[in-house]
A protein has these predicted regions:
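Class I SAM-dependent transferase core
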Residues: 1-57
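S-adenosylmethionine/decaboxylated-SAM
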Residues: 38-207
Length: 207
């Protein structure tokens, strides 16, 4: 187990962030916002590149950390949703600093439960779900509706620092995340994979 932990730490430390993303991460910490790890961000960037995704949705803008990784692929447009307007204001500035052209990143302020139903069905290739774990199952249902065939839903923080794997942990967010994993794994027409990178990623692909 010690070797695995050491290997995990080595992989996590192998990614060097650009100054803009690092600044967004530092600000997120000041806001108390949980960000994906650099290795996770790099993995997401790889997923979008390999899948050829051109249209993505993100639930949970934060200060823009994950979005900055997603838009490193110049062909991808991003719609990002969050209820926290102050953090989103900073995210807009970080996207601008990163060179995102006008119209490439659409930042929407509002609750995911209100915004997701307004987005067009089967119009996106990639969705990153990084919102409130207590709302994740309902959000995931809407996110799957948005995806085209072959599209990919990625749920961030799917292991919650290892708490999801500990049967003794019964906090609300842990139980909700376990239920989401079970729900998606039992949903017909999708293939799932739980990846132990960063804080965990749950991948669900539309067959």
């Amino acid at each position: 187990m010690a070797d695995f932990v050491q290997a995990w730490a080595y992989a996590e430390e192998s990614v060097v962030e650009d100054p803009i993303t690092a600044s967004a991460r530092d600000l997120a910490a000041e806001f108390g916002i949980r960000s994906i790890s650099p290795a996770t961000g790099n993995f997401l960037r790889m997923l979008t590149a390999l899948s050829g995704a051109t249209a993505a949705v993100e639930v949970g803008t934060g200060t823009g950390v994950s979005g900055l990784y997603l838009i490193q692929d110049s062909s991808l447009t991003l719609t990002t949703i969050d209820i926290e307007s102050e953090a989103q204001h900073h995210a807009r500035e970080f996207f601008r600093q990163a060179g995102a052209r006008a119209g490439r990143v659409r930042v929407i302020n509002g609750a995911s439960a209100d915004i997701l139903p307004r987005l067009a069905t089967s119009s996106y290739d990639f969705v990153l779900l990084d919102g409130d774990p207590l709302e994740a199952e309902g959000d995931a249902t809407e996110c799957l509706r948005l995806l085209r065939r072959g599209g990919l839903l990625v749920v961030a923080h799917a292991l919650l620092g290892g708490k999801v794997a500990d049967p003794a942990r019964r906090e609300d967010d842990v139980v909700a995340t376990r239920n989401l994993i079970k729900h998606l794994s039992r949903t017909e027409g999708i293939t799932t994979s739980l990846v132990p990178i960063g804080d965990g990623l749950l991948l669900a692909r539309i067959d």
